[in-house]
Each structure stands twice: as structure tokens, then as C-alpha cells.
Regions:
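Structured segments of extracytoplasmic/periplasmic soluble domains
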Residues: 4-12, 76-83, 110-123
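Alpha-helical scaffolding within the catalytic cores
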Residues: 26-41, 64-80, 102-110
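Glycine-enriched alpha-helix->loop->beta-strand junction motifs that scaffold or abut catalytic
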Residues: 41-45, 85, 116
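Aromatic- and acid-rich polysaccharide-binding/catalytic face
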Residues: 33-67, 123-125
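Substrate-binding cleft of secreted/luminal carbohydrate-active enzymes
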Residues: 86-160
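Aromatic-lined carbohydrate-recognition surfaces of secreted/lumenal glycan-active proteins
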Residues: 2-32, 85-98, 122
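Intrinsically disordered, low-complexity coil segments
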Residues: 56-65, 82-83, 130-132, 140
Length: 160
């Protein structure tokens, strides 16, 4: 399906302005990550999807669990992206409801800083589901942490 979609978009529709990311769920592990890989000629970027969780309202334990998983995933993804000459990204992440007041600066940033990630993408903010959001907005109680994250020298947004 991945190959058919890419071929349809590029050959049939003539689209040339799309980057194609292969990104199985983060729990695929190094032994299964490439099991459905469509081939180097169909992929531009290798990514992982891994979400944080707040376990029993224990920010420190939740942070440690997230770091362990993400470091393992980004380590094997670094090897794979080098072997296949691909960019790598953190294609989906976030903490639903942002219950950690410092999720951006003390959970996400420390775990990505040592890896050559081309981009990080959080999941959506649902307009119709209270509590189902992954990015702060102006007026949100922890918006200052996302703002501090955005001002780090290592972080660049699309409009910069």
C-alpha cells in the first residue's frame, strides 16, 4: 500500500514536493522496525512514533520510562538512518493533556538533544475533545514551558 500510494502520487499525479517518511510504531523494536520497509527508493525519512504517559501522576518515573524507550529507539534509528542514507525524525510524540508542567524542556528536549533529528512532530489538539491536546497554546497554564523550548538555540520552527 505504501509503494502504491507513493507511485500514484508521484507517477500518476506528478507530485514532487512530498517527503516520504517510514515510521512504524515505536514499540516495533530494532528486530521488527524494517519488517515492512518498502525500500530505500520509496523512503526519504525514517521516523519513530512514541508517546509519553503520566503514570500514577509521577512525573519523574514517567519521564524516566519515556527516556529509556526513546533513547533505545533513537539509537537504533541512528544506525538504520546512517546505513540507509536517510534523514531521521521523531514523527509523532507528545503527552496527552500535558500533565507534566515541564514536558517540553525537561522531558522532550533532554532526550532528543544528542540525536540528529530532522524534526519532531507532536500529535493534534482536538477541538471537540476536552483534554485531548499535545501542544500548548497562549493562555494554557504550562505555555511558558513550550515557549522556553521554542527559544532554545537547538530548536528551529518552520517559520524561522
Amino acid at each position: 500500500l505504501y509503494r502504491l500510494t507513493r507511485l500514484y502520487c508521484t507517477k500518476e499525479r506528478g507530485l514532487t514536493n512530498i517527503l516520504w517518511c517510514y515510521s512504524p510504531n515505536g514499540d516495533a523494536g530494532p528486530e521488527n522496525y524494517m519488517s515492512r520497509y518498502p525500500g530505500d527508493e520509496f523512503v526519504d525519512i525514517l521516523g519513530i512514533d512514541t508517546y509519553a504517559g503520566l503514570r500514577d501522576n509521577n512525573v519523574e518515573a514517567s519521564r524516566a520510562f519515556f527516556w529509556e524507550a526513546v533513547k533505545s529507539q533513537l539509537t537504533y534509528l541512528t544506525v538504520l538512518s546512517n546505513d540507509h542514507h536517510k534523514l531521521m525524525c521523531f514523527s509523532e510524540t507528545g503527552l496527552e493533556g500535558l500533565g507534566d508542567p515541564h514536558w517540553w524542556t525537561e522531558t522532550l528536549e533532554p532526550v532528543i538533544r544528542d540525536y540528529s533529528i530532522s524534526y519532531v512532530l507532536t500529535w493534534r489538539n482536538a477541538h471537540d475533545q476536552p483534554g485531548h491536546f499535545y501542544a500548548a497554546w497562549e493562555g494554557f497554564e504550562h505555555a511558558d514551558d513550550m515557549k522556553a523550548f521554542s527559544e532554545l538555540d537547538s530548536i528551529v520552527f518552520l517559520d524561522e
